[in-house]
């Protein structure tokens, strides 16, 4: 059983690692980040990374291991959201470390961190996948995932 635990600890979880990287960047600004803001920054980091050709389909296949879902306030990675839901609308204060493999995305992340979260929510609501599935949202959530193609389409249509 202990061996299983250690294997779990070493398992790569790229979306969670990207979330930790974003949190660390936000903490470095001294402002921190809320759970809602984290979700929007994660989403738009991927969208803008595709647009700037820093992220390609292979990167997505290797790193997009936890899907976003269509929720009231835009795309949400459910397991990451639930991990930080204890903070409510407050700043996440658990210290996190940046991951070198995501450093190419730092300019995008830093720019997104400067934007108002309400603006990011509104922008995410303009994307076709969210618009076409908004009616599936019940009590703020849906089980409609964003597939790789949905992310690529969002990046291409919002240039």
Question: Predicted regions span which residues?
Answer:
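Domain-edge interaction signal
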Residues: 1-159
């Amino acid at each position: 059983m202990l061996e299983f635990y250690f294997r779990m600890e070493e398992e790569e979880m790229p979306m969670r690692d990207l979330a930790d990287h974003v949190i660390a960047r936000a903490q470095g600004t001294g402002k921190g980040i809320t759970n809602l803001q984290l979700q929007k920054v994660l989403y738009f980091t991927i969208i803008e990374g595709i647009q700037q050709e820093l992220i390609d389909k292979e990167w997505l296949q290797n790193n997009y291991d936890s899907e976003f879902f269509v929720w009231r306030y835009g795309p949400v990675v459910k397991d990451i959201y639930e991990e930080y839901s204890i903070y409510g609308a407050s700043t996440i204060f658990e210290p996190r470390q940046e991951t070198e493999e995501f450093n190419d995305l730092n300019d995008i992340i830093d720019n997104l961190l400067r934007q108002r979260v309400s603006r990011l929510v509104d922008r995410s609501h303009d994307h076709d996948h969210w618009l076409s599935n908004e009616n599936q949202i019940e009590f703020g959530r849906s089980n409609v995932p964003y597939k790789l193609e949905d992310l690529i389409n969002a990046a291409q249509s919002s240039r």
